[in-house]
Amino acid sequence: MNTRKNAPLALVTGASRGIGKAIAEALAEAGYHLILTCSHTLPDLQEVAACLEEKYGITCTAMAADASEPAAIEKVFASLDHLDVLVNNAGISYIGLLTDMSVEEWQHVLNTNLSSCFYTSRLAVPLMLLKHS
């Protein structure tokens, strides 16, 4: 059981299911405290967080935050004073024919899968560098 206040802290986006959930579990097993985010499935994410806390004895915070929205990501980072690991896992896909996809849908996919990595990383790096200064 890892209840140390100075345990490493990891943030995982898109952590309510699939790869993000598996990454969160691996980090919890390794003793990391976690901040987990997702855009639409907060009840699922809260269940994941509760299970990880119970199973691994870590602190796990679930937050609704659309990684493609800079303001939502800024709210997540506003309460952090350090961060050791960032996992940019949030992602979506478009199911259908390319010829049926609108420009808006394409922009949403790009914003979620690519721009979100920029939004989170630009806020995470300064916190990560604090540990090394």
Q: What are these regions, as identified by a protein language model?
A:
Residues 7-8, 82-83, 128-133:
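Active-site loop of short-chain dehydrogenase/reductase
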Residues 16-18:
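Conserved glycine-rich cofactor-binding loop
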Residues 30-47:
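Conserved glycine-rich Rossmann-like NAD(P)H-binding loop of the short-chain dehydrogenase/reductase
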Residues 42, 63-75, 103:
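The beta1-alpha1 cofactor-binding region of Rossmann-like NAD(H)/NADP(H)-dependent oxidoreductases
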Residues 90-94:
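Conserved NAD(P)H cofactor-binding loop of Rossmann-fold oxidoreductase domains
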Residues 97-98, 105-110:
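Substrate-binding pocket helix/loop in short-chain dehydrogenase/reductase
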Residues 121-122:
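A short, exposed helix-loop element centered on a Lys and neighboring polar residues
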